Every structure is written in C-alpha cells, then in structure tokens.
Amino acid sequence: MKDFTEQEKIIVLDFGSQYNQLITRRIREFGVYSELHPHTITVEEMKALNPTGIIFSGGPNSVYDEDAFRADERIFDMGIPILGICYGMQLMTTHFGGKVERAKDREYGKADIHVEKPNRLFAGLPTDQVVWMSHGDLVVEEPAGFEVTITSKSCPIAGIADEERSLYGVQFHPEVRHSVYGNELLKNFALNVCGCKGDWTMENFSEVEIAKIQEIVGDKKVLLALSGGVDSSVVGVLIHKAIGDQLTCIFVDHGLLRKGEADQVMATLQGEFNMNIIKVDAKKRFMDKLAGVSDPEQKRKIIGNEFIYVFDDEANKLDGVEFLAQGTLYTDIIESGTATAQTIKSHHNVGGLPEDMQFKLIEPLNTLFKDEVRALGTELGMPDAIVWRQPFPGPGLGIRVLGEITEEKLEIVRDSDYILREEIKNAGLEREIWQYFTALPNIRSVGVMGDGRTYDHTVVVRAVTSIDGMTADWARIPWDVLEKISVRIVNEVDHVNRVVYDITSKPPATVEWE
C-alpha cells in the first residue's frame, strides 16, 4: 500500500471558478487522484503534498484587481508541470512577464479555436476544436520563453506553452463538457505531460482509508449516523472493515424515511453484514420539534441538531465513544461553500451541527464524488440493492415536504415516491436515471374526480441524469412511463389530484427542492 505522499496526484488550486470541482472530477476519471486546495496554499504545504502536477483554476477576478486571488509565486519554481486555465493562464502570463488586458467584450459561451503549434497537451487531437470560453480579460503578449499555441477569432492568444519547463496555459475551460476535446486535453496533461500511470482505484482508496481509520481511532469507539442511504451505508461498511465491533451504528427512525426503509436497512446491514446497529424510534421527538416550522434552512438545522442530540443520548450509554462518523461527500463540502465560493445551501452533513457537539468527526468519503462512492461500495462487496439505492438526504422527507411538515403530507410523499420507484424499475430505467423522487410543493389546485370537485395537493416528480452530482439535466422519461406514474399517483394516493414533472437542470436549480 502506497503512502499518501507517494501516490500520484494532481493538485487543483481554487481561484474561485464555478467549474473548479469539475477539474478535479475529470482528472480522477483517468485513474489519477486529484484534490482541490485553496489558492492560499504555501509552497511548503504544496511540497508536503508531493504533487505530480498542478492546475490553476479559472476565477472571477482580473489579475490587476487590488484584491485579486494570488498564488505563492514560488510554486512556479517547483519544477513540476503546471496547467493554467483561464484566470490561471493569466496569472502565469503576468508572473513570467507577459501582458494581460481587459477584453473589449466579455467572451462567454462556445467558441472555435485553432491549434497553431501542437504539443504534448494536444497530442492526438484535431487542430480545430469547439471549446467553452468564460473570460473578461485576455493575454495580449505572451511571456518570454513561451509560444502561442492556440488562437481564436476574438482571442488571438488563447493558449501558451513553455514545453521545456512543462508550463501550459489555455484561455478556455477544458473541464466543461461543452469543450468537445476538453477531457482528452486534461488526460494528456495528466498522463503525457505529468507522466502519471493512471492506476488510482477504489481498491487503493479503501486500503488507504482503512489504514487511516485504524490509526486515527485506535482502540476507541465510533458512532455512525446511519440514515440507510448510499453514503452512510458505504461509510459504515468501510469503517466496520477497519475496526469491526468498535463501530456502533445509530439508526434513527425520525419519521421522515421512505416507505419500508427502516425494515430494509436493518435486514441488510445488520442481517447480512453483522454490523452493530442500535435503532432509535424518535418520530415523536422530531415531529414535535418541527411543528409549525416552514423555513427550509430552519428545518435542516432542527433535523441536524436533533440527530446529534439523539446520538449524544445514545453515546452516554456507551463507554469510550470519541468519534462520530458521517457520509459527507466532496459535493456536500463544495455546495456548502468554501473561501472562494458562495454558499448554495447548508448541507445536512456540514451545516446544522450544534456548537457543543461532544464528538470528533470522521468523514472518510469527503474527498469522493457520488459515482466514486458507488464504485467503493462495489469494491467493498456490497450488494447492488444498497450501492444503487436512490440518493437520500440526511433530513429525509423533511426537505421533500415544502413548508410545514405533517403526517398527512409525509404519507403523500412516501406513497407517491414508492409508486415512482416501482414504475422506474418496471421500465428498466434504474441505471439510466441518476436520481428520482417526488416532492410536495405545498400547492393545492382544483380538480374533478368522479362527479365531484376536488381541491387537493400537487405532487412534483423530479428525475435527473448526472455523472458526479455537480451538474445535472432533467431526465427524458418516456411519455408512456410518465403517464403510468401520474395515473397511479392520482388514483392510489389520497388527497392528490395533480402531478407535474420538473424539467429544470442543475444549475440553475439544485436537485432537491429545499
């Protein structure tokens, strides 16, 4: 097993681009481990990471802004390959004596580029390509020792390179899928320029994480916030493999679970994996706290707090418990805000924790994306029934019932969601659709059922396709399948007379409604 410092890795420096997490994700697709770090990292800290290559992300600043994000300039002298993307290319240009100016017109969207001087970055790629641009400044004079490698109609210097020092810059965003050959360019950087072997796998990851968990925990005990979803289930099996019965799983039935979920969780994880699970019936406790609350952020905070307090109560019955495990993912951390990104919404695993929490946190999945977690689950020998379960938020149905939560509303969402999952399975679409669920938007509308007028609830069906959860598109479910879903919901679920389908992508929307 390799030590982390010996592992091939490409570090992405975060200069505030909305796409920076995609760079990390793309690099991992090539079997090369990659992490996102703040631009404030020092050269000493960077050397300790021992990267094989570095990527400077894009960002919203101008390099001439007084408060523009900077990098430790000594990083350029480390003698390892660096790729500057958009703002990153402009930083590289000014550092080495080139010139950057404000563009007459901001360039945003698809653009045609021409590769004037092919190099290792463009090995095997066509000279004419469609890419995604998003910039307000541009390079007007390349630095000494660099060559202009790419041009476009509105950006005469769209790429630069110093092959001898393995320094490259591109004005466009290869990490965005609109850049047709962007993946291939990043792969060339990782494998051709940096010389990575591309042998990072979930087997490597699990070996490293198991060793880390054993080292951190020692002979202490760990509590896991087990929700029954993919993330907490995978982290539970991973930690159980590391420390066995030192792990106690606290499965809280807060009354916000999907239909039949509690029984399935106990049967699978306790029955098949012999995990130590304490089931806590806390339905009344949660519903009392949530009574009259309609604000989504307040609901998340209440649910998050009550979860921790329940764990605290259970932990007091056990000896030697020092750690709380969570299934926090990389996307959770990113969406909850970083030093250079605006908070979208507080996440149940990284927000809402009480200040007096008594446990130390263990989050072994917090560098993984959702598809990587599924791959890890398979590597750990978990059945598809768990690994490919629909993603389920920690607050459960509490954020799929918009507005105040009542038992009647919860039953509507449970029953409608069960029908949706049945019909998606019957249509053979389970693996094609990344996430699908129903939500209750707290909207009533007039309808006619039988010979009478109704004034009942509207159910929203949400289904999206995605690879990593950072971006998502609404799923093109066949009309006949949507019809079956709608007919069954209005006929089988009480107090529902209308079904609508959400056809909004992420962005601008998030996957969940709250």
Curated annotation (Swiss-Prot):
Residue stretches making up the Glutamine amidotransferase type-1 domain: 9-199
Xref: CDD domains: GATase1_GMP_Synthase, GMP_synthase_C
Gene3D superfamilies hit by this protein: 3.30.300.10, 3.40.50.880, HUPs
GO molecular function annotations of the record: ATP binding; GMP synthase activity
Domain GMPS ATP-PPase: residue ranges: 200-389
Record-level GO cellular component terms: cytosol
Reactions it catalyzes: XMP + L-glutamine + ATP + H2O = GMP + L-glutamate + AMP + diphosphate + 2 H(+)
Active site: C86 (nucleophile), H173, E175
Annotated InterPro entries: Class_I_gatase-like, GATASE, GMP_synth_C, GMP_synth_GATase, GMP_synthase, GMPS_ATP_PPase_dom, NAD/GMP_synthase, Rossmann-like_a/b/a_fold
Pathway the protein contributes to: Purine metabolism; GMP biosynthesis; GMP from XMP (L-Gln route): step 1/1
Pfam families associated with the record: GATase, GMP_synt_C, NAD_synthase
Domain of life: Bacteria
Residues holding ATP: S227, G228, G229, V230, D231, S232, S233
Keywords: ATP-binding, Glutamine amidotransferase, GMP biosynthesis, Ligase, Nucleotide-binding, Purine biosynthesis
EC id: 6.3.5.2
HAMAP family xref list: GMP_synthase (MF_00344)
NCBIfam families: guaA_Cterm, guaA_Nterm, PRK00074.1
PANTHER family: GMP SYNTHASE [GLUTAMINE-HYDROLYZING], GMP SYNTHASE-RELATED
Biological function: Catalyzes the synthesis of GMP from XMP.
Subunit structure as annotated in this protein's UniProt entry: Homodimer.
The protein's name in its UniProt record: GMP synthase [glutamine-hydrolyzing]
Species of origin: Listeria monocytogenes serotype 4b (strain F2365)
